[in-house]
Amino acid sequence: MSERSGIFAGDDPFVLARAWLAEAEASEPNDPNAIALSTVDADGLPNARMVLLKEIESHGAGQGGFVFYTNYGSAKGQEIAQAGKAAFVCHWKSLHRQIRVRGLTETEDGPQADAYYASRSLKSRLGAWASDQSKPLSSRGALMADVARVTAEQGTNPKRPPFWGGVRITPLEIEFWADGAFRLHDRFQWRRGSVDDPWEVQRLNP
């Protein structure tokens, strides 16, 4: 494959990412929107964890972003706030494909975050209030006591916590990878110097 065609075809990486995710949703048995999110702490030590990608935004002309939700006081929330950058990879074993993303971060704590929070189950909404994410916890019993307290305080229609919301990654690099025989994989990298620059696309060695 000397030029982009087939599964790599298209002029907008966000549209392409959406298409790949849609295929994964039809074939991947568990959490096709799971991503391994990487951040760094103040000392530059990397951290990685699995989170769920909730939206691939596509605004046309090669602009868009990737959105997930978290507690802003968590380790990842604090590291993202400090660095303003993050990376992730999503790998689909059923498709033998993956997407890697590196980019700049910003919080999404307006109506979009409110709407997503409201779409969650009541127990998940209350859990967001109860969990002081990433902080030490004496016991599971203590956590459940916090859940009971929050349930009594918030009732059946809790508002989104001010410390919980979305994070948008606006990419500077997106790589689309597909497995090839004898490890001769196909890799295409979309890259730009800033979010306002046009994308440059190149094939990479396996």
Swiss-Prot record:
Cofactor binding remark: Binds 1 FMN per subunit.
Superkingdom of this protein's organism: Bacteria
Gene Ontology biological process: pyridoxine biosynthetic process
Keywords: Flavoprotein, FMN, Oxidoreductase, Pyridoxine biosynthesis
Gene this chain is encoded by: pdxH
Positions with a binding annotation for FMN: 49-54, 69-70, 76, 98, 133-134, 177, 187
EC number in record: 1.4.3.5
Record field: catalytic activity: pyridoxamine 5'-phosphate + O2 + H2O = pyridoxal 5'-phosphate + H2O2 + NH4(+); pyridoxine 5'-phosphate + O2 = pyridoxal 5'-phosphate + H2O2
Enzyme class per UniProt: oxidoreductase
GO molecular function terms noted in the UniProt entry: FMN binding; pyridoxamine phosphate oxidase activity
Family recorded in the similarity comment: Belongs to the pyridoxamine 5'-phosphate oxidase family.
Protein's UniProt name: Pyridoxine/pyridoxamine 5'-phosphate oxidase
One Pfam family in the UniProt entry: PNPOx_N
Quaternary structure note: Homodimer.
